[in-house]
Curated annotation (Swiss-Prot):
Full protein name: Small ribosomal subunit protein uS12
Keywords, alphabetical: Methylation, Ribonucleoprotein, Ribosomal protein, RNA-binding, rRNA-binding, tRNA-binding
Pfam hit, one: Ribosom_S12_S23
Superkingdom, natural source: Bacteria
The encoding gene: rpsL
Length: 123
């Protein structure tokens, strides 16, 4: 516990909060080009083939990002929109690709939670 004199001399130091998505550089989303589209396996208790892509952003940073939803039309040189948000069971994946934006199509036949997967309202 500091004395009043110590507080006058030094003051309290503000805690600096580290960003969870540093490659976005304080932007809500960033555009990028896919350099590699592949599947990975998740961490220990889970088992699957998760779809991910290596993306070179417009600021030159290369990140690994997750492709949400069932099925996708991404390939090398596809232009995508990246948002923050990590995938808990994939180490090193701290970004999501936005469905229904730029080259990535929305999820087909999606009935619920459509806005998160870029699906239009079914007729």
């Amino acid at each position: 516990m500091p004395t009043i004199n110590q507080l006058i001399r030094k003051g309290r130091e503000k805690k600096v909060r580290k960003s969870t998505a540093p490659a976005l550089k304080c932007n809500p989303q960033k555009r990028g080009v896919c350099t590699r589209v592949y599947t990975t396996t998740p961490k220990k208790p889970n088992s699957a083939l998760r779809k991910v892509a290596r993306v070179r952003l417009t600021n030159g940073i290369v990140v690994t990002s997750y492709i949400p939803g069932v099925g996708h039309n991404l390939q090398e040189h596809s232009v995508v929109l990246i948002r923050g948000g990590r995938v808990k069971d994939l180490p090193g994946v701290r970004y999501h690709i936005v469905r229904g934006a730029l080259d990535l199509a929305g999820v087909k036949d999606r009935k619920q939670g459509r806005s998160k997967y870029g699906a239009k309202r079914p007729k």
